[in-house]
């Protein structure tokens, strides 16, 4: 009788683990640690969102091609052609100064060009953001500058071919941007961007053609 009373007890220990989770022993051992990490991230996120500047952004912009480099455009020398771009852009803040209104971001874009030629462009560049303008209490204004990046197009644009017909799909990506927002809604920006591909003074090629340039207007949500 004593033996019979103890016989059923081994059964729950043999069958219990299978219906309870079905996970391998390794995952069962690691699950508590993973849960703690995820919980910590969730608890920390609201603090970062409230107590710090936004570090991420998503945006969209559209632009039209002009036939001069950014310097000539700023001097008023530009002719616009029937070549357009629609693009998605995203950025992440990598560093923020503790004493100056200055931060470093990594900015990426993917866009589709259409009009005289149809092609896709992907580009990425480190970008400096300056937010120290004296009128920012009235209109938040940020200057973003990215002189050195990488731009790749799915095909060589006819607007970038030299006299011999050659061109490069990979060129330097340069961007110059002014972003505007209301002081109480700095997470929503309207921006004007000069989007430029170049050879860095014939360093990347010497085909004798200027890279594409677009004057673009866009909207960005920072979070």
Where are these regions (language model features)?
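A glycine-rich, hydrophobic loop/mini-helix early in the fold
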Residues: 89-107
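Outer-membrane beta-barrel transmembrane domain signature
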Residues: 94-96, 109-215, 220-223
């Amino acid at each position: 009788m004593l033996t019979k009373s103890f016989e059923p007890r081994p059964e729950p220990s043999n069958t219990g683990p299978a219906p309870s989770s079905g996970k391998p022993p390794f995952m069962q051992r690691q699950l508590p640690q993973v849960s703690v990490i995820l919980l910590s991230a969730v608890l920390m996120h609201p603090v970062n969102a409230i107590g710090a500047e936004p570090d991420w952004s998503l945006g969209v912009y559209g632009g039209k091609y002009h036939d001069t480099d950014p310097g000539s455009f700023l001097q008023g020398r530009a002719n616009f052609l029937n070549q357009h771009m629609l693009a998605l852009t995203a950025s992440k803040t990598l560093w923020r100064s503790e004493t100056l209104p200055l931060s470093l971001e990594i900015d990426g874009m993917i866009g589709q060009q259409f009009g005289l030629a149809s092609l896709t462009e992907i580009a990425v560049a480190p970008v400096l953001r300056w937010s120290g303008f004296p009128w920012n209490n009235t209109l938040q204004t940020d200057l973003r500058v990215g002189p050195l990046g990488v731009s790749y197009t799915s095909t060589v644009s006819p607007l970038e071919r030299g006299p011999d017909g050659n061109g490069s799909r990979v060129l330097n990506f340069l961007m110059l941007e002014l972003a505007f927002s209301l002081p109480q809604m700095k997470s929503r920006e309207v921006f004007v961007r000069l989007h430029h591909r170049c050879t860095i003074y014939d360093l990347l090629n010497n085909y004798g053609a200027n890279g594409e340039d677009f004057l673009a207007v866009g909207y960005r949500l920072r979070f």
